[in-house]
Amino acid sequence: MNYMKRRLLLFAGILLLVALAGCSTTDPITSESEGIWNHFFVYPMSWLITTVANLLNGSYGLSIIIVTILIRLALLPLTLKQQKSMRAMQVIRPEMEAIQKKYKEKGSKDPKVQQEMQKELLGLYQKHGVNPMAGCLPLFIQLPILMAFYFAIMRTEEIRYHTFLWFDLGQPDYILPFVAGITTYFQFKMTMSHQQQMQKTNPSDSDNPMANMMQMQMKVMLYVMPVMIIIAGLSLPSALSLYWVIGNIFMIIQTYFIVVKAPPLEVEQTKQKSSKPNKA
């Protein structure tokens, strides 16, 4: 369920962005803007948007599309590392559960027993070269970058005076937010469907209260997130809706190839078992 937890955390961050958009400063960002966040995060993103737009004859719409894709591609190695770490944790999960079951029978509330269990789990992680925290670090690196780009779009003054396709980038649109909401739904649905499929291969999940609670939260978010995106998009500059649409499409493709098309866990677990040296 680790993947679901991280997805929920990421979408919680997006919800925070939506909320902050309504109450944060909308002063134009410039090289003279004060503060570490403005100077080292938001302004460089704004500069990149403007530079790419200038190369495209002033098309800020195309610039937002291209920069969104470039940022997502730049973050792809982190995403792959995160997915690899989570995948490794899922592969060794049967061994982890066996250790936890063994110490539960011994009396898991005993501090000494807990210490022994943690020591054995740590040995298991080291044996397979797995770091349980490795999947979290990429997420905390991605969020500031995505937030900076988000606010750069909000505060780059030149964007406000340009159009793209049928909409004015500086004004709310009444079509694009629904496209953003629909793509958000499909992105989340794809992740949720994969997790439900994974749960079928792990019967212990059906009896796990935490896993069931996460499933319920995912079901709620499946409908809450698209609605939040649509409501926000109807009141925010359409440049942000464009960013959400392109980002969602990229994430749908990424999730399909990295998560959905990944080999079944059973295959990797079988490989792992066959690679173990036979005891004489």
Swiss-Prot record:
Q: Which GO terms describe its cellular component?
A: plasma membrane
Keyword Transport assigned: yes
Kindly list the residues that the UniProt entry marks as S-diacylglycerol cysteine lipid attachment points. C23
**Which controlled-vocabulary keywords does the entry list?**
Cell membrane, Chaperone, Lipoprotein, Membrane, Palmitate, Protein transport, Signal, Transmembrane, Transmembrane helix, Transport
Subcellular location(s): the record lists: Cell membrane
Stated membrane topology is: Multi-pass membrane protein
What does the record list as GO biological process?
A: protein insertion into membrane; protein transport
Is the keyword Protein transport in the record?
Answer: yes
Q: Give lipid-anchored residues (N-palmitoyl cysteine).
A: C23
List the residue ranges forming a coiled coil, or say none: none
Entry's transmembrane regions: 60-80, 133-153, 163-183, 227-247, 248-268
Q: What GO molecular function annotation could you give as one example from this UniProt entry?
A: membrane insertase activity
Principal subcellular localisation of the protein: membrane
Checking PROSITE patterns in the record gives: PROKAR_LIPOPROTEIN
Q: Which residues form the signal peptide?
A: 1-22
Give the protein's biological function: Required for the insertion and/or proper folding and/or complex formation of integral membrane proteins into the membrane. Involved in integration of membrane proteins that insert both dependently and independently of the Sec translocase complex, as well as at least some lipoproteins.
Into which family does the record put it?
Belongs to the OXA1/ALB3/YidC family. Type 2 subfamily.
Q: Which HAMAP family match?
A: YidC_type2
Q: What is this protein called?
A: Membrane protein insertase YidC 2
Tell me what organism the protein belongs to: Halalkalibacterium halodurans (strain ATCC BAA-125 / DSM 18197 / FERM 7344 / JCM 9153 / C-125) (Bacillus halodurans)
